[in-house]
A protein has these predicted regions:
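Structural and coupling elements of P-loop NTPases
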Residues: 1-689
Length: 689
């Protein structure tokens, strides 16, 4: 059937892996008869997890759009990965959602996925709802979990449904606002007598929250006058939009308990796209302003995700103005390229349904639009205003990518270009110093998936290794050395003779060269040759072959031959002085030091500080984070070489709640006890090369 923006609900599913998001999608589809049997992740038959890697690993790695039609409305459920290595997908989904539904289980309760889901929605300014799943599991306790939610997230958290229990078994549920009870098939059953006390308690709390949305309602509340059904619905919708009402729903996906009630409440109370948070638009000069969806405007779409399969590229979009029709020719505002739409679809997991029109507020898929990537805005030719693109957290987990088979490096690079179209949250590039291809992601799971996709999609195998650390070398003593190059082989010979003083300096990492010769002992035209010879050498130190920094070289004496001296002869003489002089000048290794900022819960402070001490870190300060109550920001300086596995280790220490940034600040001397191993490894690598 045809829909308008008023009939659309775009809901972002959040929560940790295993908390029932994909199962809930299956239950919604089954309840609305969109599928004939419930898929299971273990069998690889869920609609939302259709990628080969998702089936193999049995967890989501990309978001998927599951449209559910209920009560003359279309609910686009955007199912997101539960593991936060794939948080880039969540960032993208939140840009087109109008509300979020956070899943957690009645057995496990609040977890890191619950907390992060709340923070994502808070940061995005989107309404939040909770769904407590798996009421049928042993030791499930809805009311304990509800109390935990209210304790953590405040008085706005109110159960819109709660279970009817026989012993510990959920046999039905109560809809708070309808004041009715339902079974797993959504059929009304008698309301238990003991439910009335809970209804009265929860309705009193809901009325108080609703009263705060409007002065007239507040006045009625204080006068103890009941709200009409229309006033209550309007107040609930306003409260959800303003985040002063956070509904809690419950159910069991595989029995269907609660699914119909959840769908009905989403249709009734969740904001439609016209009521959702405005987007941000950017003009040609970079000025930002608010953008509100306009069903009557000229056609515009925002591309929020990209997936590629054997048939080509699929660009997932939300219509933000007018309607998108398959006869249109649109322009990519970023590139100016024109694209004829042609094939346009409604997504449902891996299956797309062809359509000729997608209305404002709805979600669709374009296929084979060459110039389009995630974050692009499409509009009629001549459109210059675009929607602000995504911003991802800086990826901190870095590894080096090596070809398993020599000669396939170009195929790997081309494959990463394609994978980048699907996942904008990772970065890659060649390190000019180490000559390694460096890939950076959120964590090891993300990079593992990318390597697997290189093999499965682009038929090239790559392995990940720890990235080399950019050490440096310097000297600690002043030395004076004589470098002499003399060679006679018939005809013109070669002669260069220099006396050079090497000493440490602190002004610049780059070598400082000085000329103190007098009397023409080294002709002026050969002094640049001496400097060039030294600069050719400082790229490779005498300890482990790392570049030499903070070095001053002073040419203070020398001699020449009127016939045999040449540019090359003096370059060679300078090189001899370097190779013979630096080993006697107290050479030492320097390591990069990073400025570390770690955001962690108070409860993990001891573990994190102890771990930093093991990494030779120096804690510079600790302060409460004003934006995250119960969290601390730890500032430290730490050797970069000690941080290779920090993403994984911090995740383990903080159960996934911690995050960090690390930025290079300077070089410092490596402790002598650590230098031998670094030198040994560098020499071994050179021999193997």
């Amino acid at each position: 059937m045809g829909y308008t923006a008023n009939d659309i609900r775009n809901i972002c599913l959040l929560g940790h892996g295993g908390d029932g998001k994909s199962a809930l999608c299956e239950s919604m589809l089954f309840t609305t008869k969109a599928i004939t049997r419930l898929g299971k992740r273990a069998d690889g038959t869920t609609v939302s997890d259709f990628d080969d890697e998702e089936k193999k690993r049995q967890y989501s790695i990309s978001s998927s759009v599951i449209p559910v039609e209920y009560s003359k409305c279309k609910i686009n459920v955007i199912d997101n990965p539960g593991y936060f290595d794939f948080a880039g997908q969540i960032v993208q989904s939140l840009r087109v959602a109008d509300a979020g539904l956070i899943c957690l289980t009645a057995k496990s309760g609040i977890g890191v996925g619950t907390e992060k889901g709340w923070k994502y929605l808070q940061k995005a300014g989107l309404p939040a709802m909770f769904y407590i799943s798996k009421l049928d599991e042993e030791h499930a306790n809805f009311f304990n979990v509800l109390d935990s939610l209210r304790e953590m997230f405040g008085a706005s958290v109110i159960p819109f449904t709660f279970p009817i229990l026989q012993g510990e078994t959920a046999v039905g549920l109560v809809d708070l606002i309808e004041k009715k009870a339902f079974d797993a098939n959504g059929k009304e059953i008698p309301l238990p007598a003991d439910a009335n006390d809970k209804i009265e308690e929860y309705m009193a709390e809901l009325n108080e929250q609703v009263a705060e949305t409007d002065e007239a309602l507040m006045e009625k509340f204080f006068m103890e006058e009941p709200f009409t059904a229309e006033e209550l619905q309007t107040g609930i919708k306003a409260g959800i939009r303003e985040r002063s009402v956070t509904p809690v729903f419950c159910g069991c996906a595989y029995t269907g308990l609660g699914t119909t009630n959840l769908l009905a409440n989403i249709v009734k109370y969740a904001p439609n796209p016209l009521e959702g948070k405005p987007m941000t638009q950017v003009d040609e000069e970079g000025n930002e302003s608010e953008f509100k969806l306009d069903p009557n405007g000229s056609p515009m779409a925002f591309v929020f995700n990209t997936l590629a399969d054997q048939y080509g590229k699929n660009s997932y979009f939300k219509v933000i103005s007018g309607d998108m029709e398959d006869t249109l020719t649109v322009a990519n505002v970023r590139t100016g390229d024109s694209e004829k739409l042609g094939n346009m679809f409604f997504p449902k997991g891996k299956d797309n349904t062809k359509t000729s029109k997608v209305c404002c507020g709805d979600i669709g898929v374009f296929t084979k639009l060459a110039s389009v990537k995630t974050g692009d805005t499409l509009g009629l030719p001549g459109k210059t205003v675009r929607i602000k693109g995504m911003t991802y957290d800086e990826p901190m987990y870095k590894m080096a990518v090596y070809a398993k088979v020599k000669g396939t490096e170009d195929k790997i690079a081309n494959g990463l270009v394609k994978l980048k179209e699907e996942d904008e949250s990772f970065t890659y590039g060649n390190d000019p110093e180490t000559k390694e291809l460096i890939i950076a992601g959120v964590g090891d799971m993300q990079l593992s998936v990318l390597m697997a996709k290189l093999q499965s999609k682009y038929k090239v195998e790559a392995v990940l290794k720890p990235a080399k650390i950019a050490y440096r070398e310097t000297i600690k003593k002043k030395v004076e050395i004589h470098g002499r190059h003399k060679k006679q082989s018939g005809g013109h010979g070669q002669f260069g003779d220099v006396y050079i003083r090497f000493e440490p300096q602190s002004e610049s990492e780059e070598m400082i060269f000085a000329d103190e010769t007098v009397g023409g002992c080294v002709p002026k035209n050969f002094i640049p040759s001496v400097e060039k010879g030294l600069r050719n050498c400082v790229g490779k130190g005498v300890l482990a072959g790392y570049p030499v920094v903070f070095l001053k070289a002073t040419l203070y004496f020398g001699s020449y031959h009127p016939v045999d001296s040449s540019d090359m002869a003096f370059q060679t003489a300078a090189g001899i002085a370097y190779k013979e002089g630096l080993p006697t000048a107290g050479p030492t290794l320097l390591e990069p030091i990073g400025e570390l900022k770690v955001l962690i819960p108070d409860s993990n402070m001891g573990d994190v500080i102890g771990d930093l001490n093991k990494r030779r870190g120096r804690v510079m300060g600790m302060n409460p984070d004003p934006e995250n109550p119960g969290y601390q920001i730890v500032e430290a300086e730490v050797p970069v070489g000690e941080m290779t596995s920090y993403s994984i280790d911090l995740r383990a220490m903080s159960q996934g709640r911690g995050s960090y940034t690390l930025k290079f600040v300077r070089y410092e001397e490596v402790p002598q006890m650590n230098q031998a191993k670094i030198i040994e490894d560098a020499k071994k690598e050179e021999e193997e090369a």
